[in-house]
Amino acid sequence: SLVGSEMCIRDSTETVLTRWVDPTPFVPGDPKRRAERCELILKMQADGLAKRLEHAHAKTAVIGISGGLDSCLALLVAVRAMKQLGRPTTDVLAVTMPCFGTTKRTRSNAEILCDELHVSFTEIDIANTVHSHFADIGQDESVLDVTFENGQARVRTLELMDTANRTGGLVVGTGDLSELALGWATYNGDHMSMYGVNAGVPKTLVRHLVRYEADIAATTELKNVLLDILDTPVSPELLPAKNGEIAQKTEDLVGPYELHDFYLYYVLRFGFGPAKIFRLAKAAFAGRAEYPDEVLYKWLRNFYWRFFAQQFKRSCLPDGPKIGSVTLSPRGDWRMPSDAAAALWLAELEQLFPHEG
């Protein structure tokens, strides 16, 4: 057939890739340029938050602190914003809300971080509130399902929102661009805030921003806690801890963020199709034993499936600063119906690995 002939011609004349494909397109490879980029991004985030705090006449910036990477970055940005405004860093109110999955490591790191940054700190143990909420809705607490997890996230958002009202402040969102792409957030839970400072920053870049802050840290204690946060597995900590250790690791569930950020970059920045992105990924991650073709395919398929299925969360995002050329704000660069289907993209992938579909 004509289609078959075209396929044969395209296959036999496929251009050999000779250029280097960067596996981390969001992160500059040169250390000096990377440090300059990190400082610029942190300033952009702080500028955006400072403007919103001024415009809203907010007395406080309220942030839920988990001891994890994203909330750490949001806190660092909030401290910069307050300093920029000439206000005391105690106007940043960090709230830690331990529950069933909180570990000693993340809890301790949250406290040390807040102490070193000289912000106001409070702890709200949400366990009793969650128990009461589960009783209200008839949730069996022995069933560790989506309700068990999302219930905790929504209680945390409730506590933050009302704390902001009580203190005349606004809630600073912590979720990043990679989480928005994958829909890795609880709808109307950590998905919601009053201003999301990390919404334009992909996870691979979040790590480098925090590492940059560690490199320029004013004290050894601050540097050490930032490095330990960087070394902590990414986790929402919504399932009960096992022997005091994190039981739920995000990248085991949704896939490696370095792959998803690579896919995200070429989907949004260039609009490339699945086959082309898969080929670029093979070139970028060649020689990485943990990423054979089957694994690259698996997580690319997972990316498309989640990206389409989770658009409804991105259709109602809080405001936040635009950081780079790739963004998912429904008020900026990204227009996508929540009912869009991934069928065509998944069908193209199926042609690459028919046995994997």
Model-derived segments and spans:
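ATP/NTP-dependent adenylation/nucleotidyl-transfer catalytic domains that generate, transfer
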Residues: 5-6, 10-67, 71-357
